[in-house]
Amino acid sequence: MEEKNTVSLSKHIERPVEVVESHSTYILSAQGLYLTERVLRSYFKQPDLIITWKDSMRAYLTFSSPQEAQKAYLDSLRWGSQLNAIIKPFYGSHDEVLRLCKRKRIIPLQNFLTSG
C-alpha cells in the first residue's frame, strides 16, 4: 500500500518533433525594432542563410532545409527576449516572399548607418 505522502506519476511518452517535408517550411519571419543583417546573422549562424527584407522592421529568413529552419526556430524560442524580435514560421515559397517584398522596398536601417 502506498503512503499518503507519495504521488504516483504516469510515465510521459516523449515523441520527436516531426518535420513536415515541404518546399514551404524552410522560411522564418522576423519582426522587431532595430533589426539589422548583422544582428540576425549573429543569432542565426547558418552560412547559407538568405535574408530578404520586407521593410525596416520585417525580414524573411530562408534556410537551405526544413531541418535548419526548425532548429533555428527552436533556438529562437530558447533565446527568449535576448533577440528582441518575434520569430515565426512562414508557410509560403521563396517566390512568394520575393513577391511580398517587391511591393514596398525599404532599405534596412543598417544600410543608412554604413553608407557615406
Curated annotation (Swiss-Prot):
Its GO CC terms are: cytosol; nucleus; sno(s)RNA-containing ribonucleoprotein complex
Q: GO BP, one example? A: snRNA processing
Pfam families noted in UniProt: RRM_Thc1
Instruction: Name the chain's protein.
Output: Uncharacterized protein C18B5.09c
Q: Which organism is it from?
A: Schizosaccharomyces pombe (strain 972 / ATCC 24843)
